């Protein structure tokens, strides 16, 4: 049975790595779903075992955040933030700074994939209206969204996995990884400035902030549902506050997300069916399938054999190992499948420092290449649909520099935190 499980696992992850196999229309979710079904079909797992393998805490957190974010998206909240904040800048360099930090901070609390999905058209519209090359700003958006998302449990899907399985509180997660993200965003600003020096010399037409806001909204066809936002935004803020108070209130983070989602559907002014249609059900299927596939190799003892030979300890070597393996494997299978496989290993290590290092490293590694993270691909696809092309090597030259520098910062900061705390 070990051989069967290993073959299924290998085929599944090959499908995840090579999303377009010859003569097969396959993507990552379908490859994972095939693996999950195969584990049951070939007797590695029973149907009940497969169901119990799914981490419904993670699924619940994802679902709750998706419903909240979908409502804010329909309300036009993302465009409102992007347009208002970016209109403040009166030079291209200030625009770069505002864009980088707005994207990074928004990604920490609103899930980075959703942020870039809705910020990208606004950034392209702003660049065109101000006669600027949008590519440097789009690259800064990608890099900052990934770096910013590392600082909270709700910043990206892999952090949700880590937050649920590690038991680290929302506040502690933010406290420990905030320095990594803030310094990382500063690195992004100066790296983009270095690679695109023309940003420093360009100037905007002389207009006040209100004039720029009006122009940008007209260019982007912005539409805001302020009536709905009066309900959805306070509920979202309440959810974030409750995340920080989850320990004293004895409420789990997934439950808080579901409470917020139910309130926003019940009290919001957007038709619930419209919101639910925008939920990324494919991503939920992807997660559920990965849980089943990994549990299959756990059940037959393959994971235990690996654990017998690989030990992670709360040492310099352990921190370095997590950063190195994250950098390599996140490029191969992407950060979510990589994190799912790492969960059993991390649980045996039983170290909050190593959990935080994994959250930081697996996220930062996504900036190395244009295919390193889902947020990267979302920006590329939207940009191409609007006639803007970001070349692989153009991104790689700046992406690898930012990744290596931010990974060094991550290693140094997590090491200091390990020593001090």
Q: What function would you assign to each model-found segment?
A:
Residues 48-135, 281-351:
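Membrane-embedded alpha-helical segments and adjacent helix-loop junctions characteristic
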Residues 33-43, 62-65, 90-100, 141-152, ...:
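Small-residue-rich segments of transmembrane alpha-helices in multi-pass membrane proteins
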Residues 3-13, 23-43, 56-67, 229-239, ...:
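Hydrophobic mid-bilayer segments of alpha-helices in multi-pass membrane transport proteins
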Residues 107-117, 134-170, 176, 188-194, ...:
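Alpha-helical transmembrane segments and, especially, the helix-loop junctions at the ends
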Residues 185-271:
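Long, contiguous bundles of hydrophobic transmembrane helices that form the permeation core
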Residues 1-3, 23-26, 48-58, 168-180, ...:
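Interfacial loop-to-helix junctions that mark the boundaries of transmembrane helices
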Residues 93-98, 129-140, 170-178, 350-360, ...:
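Membrane-interface alpha-helices at helix entry/exit sites of multi-pass transporters
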Residues 171-220, 368-371, 375-421:
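Juxtamembrane and boundary regions of transmembrane helices in multi-pass small-molecule transporters
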């Amino acid at each position: 049975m070990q051989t069967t499980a290993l073959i299924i696992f290998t085929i599944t992850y090959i499908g995840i790595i090579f999303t377009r196999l010859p003569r097969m229309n396959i993507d990552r979710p379908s490859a994972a779903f095939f693996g999950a079904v195969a584990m049951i079909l070939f007797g590695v797992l029973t149907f009940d075992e497969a169901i119990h393998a799914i981490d419904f805490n993670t699924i619940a957190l994802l679902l709750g955040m998706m419903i909240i974010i979908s409502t804010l998206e329909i309300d036009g909240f993302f465009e409102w933030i992007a347009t208002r904040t970016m209109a403040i800048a009166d030079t291209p360099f200030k625009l770069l700074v505002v864009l980088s930090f707005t994207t990074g901070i928004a990604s920490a609390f609103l899930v980075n994939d959703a942020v870039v999905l809705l910020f990208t058209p606004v950034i392209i519209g702003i660049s065109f209206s101000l006669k600027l090359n949008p590519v440097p700003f789009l690259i800064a958006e990608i890099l900052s969204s990934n770096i910013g998302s590392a600082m909270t449990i709700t910043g990206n899907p892999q952090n949700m996995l880590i937050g649920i399985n590690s038991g680290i509180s929302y506040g502690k997660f933010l406290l420990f990884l905030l320095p990594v993200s803030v310094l990382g965003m500063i690195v992004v600003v100066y790296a983009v400035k270095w690679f695109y020096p023309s940003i420093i010399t360009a100037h905007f037409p002389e207009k006040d902030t209100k004039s720029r806001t009006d122009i940008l909204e007209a260019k982007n066809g912005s539409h805001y549902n302020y009536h709905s936002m009066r309900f959805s935004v306070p509920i979202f803020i309440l959810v974030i506050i409750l995340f920080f108070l989850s320990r004293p209130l004895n409420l789990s983070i997934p439950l808080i997300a579901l409470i917020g989602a139910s309130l926003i559907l019940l009290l919001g002014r957007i038709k619930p069916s419209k919101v639910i249609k925008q939920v990324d059900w494919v991503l939920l299927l992807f997660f559920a399938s990965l849980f089943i596939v990994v549990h299959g190799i756990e059940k037959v003892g393959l994971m235990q054999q690996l654990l017998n030979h690989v030990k992670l300890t709360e040492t310099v070597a352990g921190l370095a190992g997590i950063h190195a393996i994250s950098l390599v494997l996140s490029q191969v299978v992407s950060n979510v499948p990589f994190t799912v496989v790492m969960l059993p290993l991390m649980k045996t290590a039983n170290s909050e420092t190593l959990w935080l290092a994994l959250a930081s490293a697996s996220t930062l590694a996504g900036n190395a290449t244009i295919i390193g993270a889902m947020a990267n691909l979302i920006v590329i696809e939207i940009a191409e649909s609007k006639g803007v092309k970001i070349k692989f090597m153009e991104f790689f030259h700046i992406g690898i520099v930012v990744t290596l520098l931010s990974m060094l910062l991550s290693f140094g900061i997590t090491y200091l935190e390990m020593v001090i705390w």
